[in-house]
């Protein structure tokens, strides 16, 4: 796995809601915590997330 800011299918971070630890574990990560990612703001950071779960691509924007 790898560490990173978990994102949805549109490359948008989760703003610490739902709570990060539960969100990350639901996606088979070891744990999660609330971090800050510029310029997105509050964002869930996951530890040891499986390769198939998308993480933030810093070269791409959130496509809402």
Swiss-Prot record:
SUPFAM superfamilies: Scorpion toxin-like. CDD domains: neurotoxins_LC_scorpion. The keyword Endoplasmic reticulum does not apply. Residues 2-63 form the LCN-type CS-alpha/beta domain. The keyword RNA-binding does not apply. GO terms for cellular component: extracellular region. Its main location: secreted. InterPro entries: LCN-type_CS_alpha_beta_dom (IPR044062), Scorpion_toxin-like (IPR003614), Scorpion_toxin-like_sf (IPR036574), Scorpion_toxinL/defensin (IPR002061). One of its GO terms (biological process) is defense response. Expressed by the venom gland. One of its GO terms (molecular function) is toxin activity. Disulfide bonds join 12-62, 16-34, 20-44, 24-46. Belongs to the long (4 C-C) scorpion toxin superfamily. Sodium channel inhibitor family. Alpha subfamily. Has the structural arrangement of an alpha-helix connected to antiparallel beta-sheets by disulfide bonds (CS-alpha/beta). This is Alpha-toxin Amm3. It comes from Androctonus mauritanicus mauritanicus (Scorpion).
């Amino acid at each position: 796995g790898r560490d990173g800011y978990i994102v949805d299918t549109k490359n948008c971070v989760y703003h610490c809601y739902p709570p990060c630890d539960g969100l990350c574990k639901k996606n088979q990560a070891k744990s999660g915590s609330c971090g800050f990612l510029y310029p997105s703001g509050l964002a869930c950071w996951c530890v040891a997330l499986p390769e198939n779960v998308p993480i933030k691509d810093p070269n791409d924007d959130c496509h809402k």
